[in-house]
């Protein structure tokens, strides 16, 4: 019988193993060892290594998106929502470096994963930004000539580059809160109305 606890244990172990070894170098036996389960147990829950990676994205990133939406929705001001989004995004690199490493490295290397997730989870995540921009435009806070699709990618790109820097650095070179504020302020200066 499948156990939700064992499933979660395997996912957590996979995040660590994929971050340490990379998806292509990791083996099912590495994940089983890290999860303290038999190799065969993995196959009760997942068809193969790629299935585990997909589950990591579905479950772990799904949780992160839900948390981000919840935090953003607690704010009234579109400007504050942008700041909250930036801080939550950058905080992931500090709070869950292994997951941040997987997002930074594996999402870019696996063409199959990119095809599947560019259209779903990734879009859902960056669409939070475009929804904030549209809300600000409706309230005449943000310029009407700003295209939300372009702006969301520019903002995400700045955050993504800082996350990549932190993932590749042994020690974060900048303070996360200060960086989130600085990126948010630069972005908001570009899209604020009048």
Language-model segment annotations:
Residues 84, 88-91, 127, 131-139, ...:
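C-terminal peripheral helix-coil segments that are non-catalytic and often amphipathic
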Residues 55, 70-95, 148-155, 177:
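Hydrophobic alpha-helical connector segments
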Residues 1-21, 26-34, 51:
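Basic, helix-initiating cap at the start of DNA-binding domains
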Residues 62-69, 113-139, 149-153, 178:
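Amphipathic alpha-helical packing segments from all-alpha helical-bundle domains
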């Amino acid at each position: 019988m499948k156990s939700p606890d064992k499933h979660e244990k395997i996912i957590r172990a996979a995040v660590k193993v994929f971050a340490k070894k990379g998806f292509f170098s990791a083996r099912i036996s590495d994940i089983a060892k890290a999860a303290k389960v038999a190799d065969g147990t993995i196959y009760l829950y997942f068809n193969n290594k790629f299935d585990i990676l997909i589950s990591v994205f579905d479950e772990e990133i799904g949780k992160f998106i839900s948390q981000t939406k919840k935090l953003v929705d607690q704010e009234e001001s579109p400007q504050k929502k942008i700041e909250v989004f930036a801080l939550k995004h950058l905080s992931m690199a500090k709070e869950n470096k292994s997951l941040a490493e997987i997002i930074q490295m594996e999402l870019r290397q696996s063409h199959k994963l990119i095809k599947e997730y560019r259209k779903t989870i990734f879009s859902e995540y960056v669409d939070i930004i475009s929804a904030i921009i549209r809300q600000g435009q409706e309230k005449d806070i943000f310029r009407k000539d700003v295209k939300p699709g372009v702006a969301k990618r520019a903002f995400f790109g700045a955050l993504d580059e800082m996350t990549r820097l932190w993932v590749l650095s042994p020690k974060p070179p900048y303070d996360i809160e200060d960086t989130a504020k600085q990126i948010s302020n630069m972005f908001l200066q570009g899209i604020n109305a009048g």
